[in-house]
Amino acid sequence: MAPSEDIPSSEQRHQKIQARILSLKKQISFSKWWTALFFLISLGAAVNFRFLPPISENVRQFLGISPSSTLISIALIVYAFSALILILGRMNTASVHFHGWSHIGYLSAFYLFYYYSGTLRDNFWAVFIAGLTILSLENYRVWSVCSETIKKEEKTLAFLDK
């Protein structure tokens, strides 16, 4: 193999960097879309999921008695603090990937638990504020890391263009 085959050309490096920049911009965009999905789910929860059929007695018997609102709230608090600690820990790793999809699943489950227990109207704001806090911090983390990396990549492009 000739030495020139091991070293990518200037144009290849340029294209690779541009592809990385595009990928980072997509990560920022994905994080916004996931947050929009949470808002849509929250809209459904705000109207007590009126568009869903009522839970039948057979399903209620199969699922059993719902946990009390207090237990669900304790679980929400534990989850929210755990999620925030994990996000803050990821801030140090400089990972550019958005991890909010799992948060949306958990937060949706809390809406459903409150819905099943019949206390969604009383606890909607607790889930919404927890979700808004968690997803906002995750969005900030992704935006911060991606923006910093994009600036570095753009500096590299400027250096290659000289």
Protein language model features and the residues they cover:
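Alpha-helical transmembrane segments of polytopic membrane proteins
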Residues: 31, 69-78, 126-133
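Hydrophobic alpha-helical transmembrane segments of multipass integral membrane proteins
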Residues: 38-44, 77-84, 132-139
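N-terminal juxtamembrane cytosolic/stromal segments of multi-pass membrane proteins
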Residues: 1-31, 156-162
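Terminal transmembrane helical module of multi-pass membrane proteins
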Residues: 118-162
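Juxtamembrane "helix-exit" motif on the non-cytosolic side of transmembrane helices
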Residues: 49-59, 85-91, 112-122
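Membrane-water interface of transmembrane alpha-helices
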Residues: 2-7, 80-85, 144-147
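Loop-to-transmembrane helix junctions at the membrane interface
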Residues: 76-112
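Hydrophobic transmembrane helix segments
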Residues: 35-73
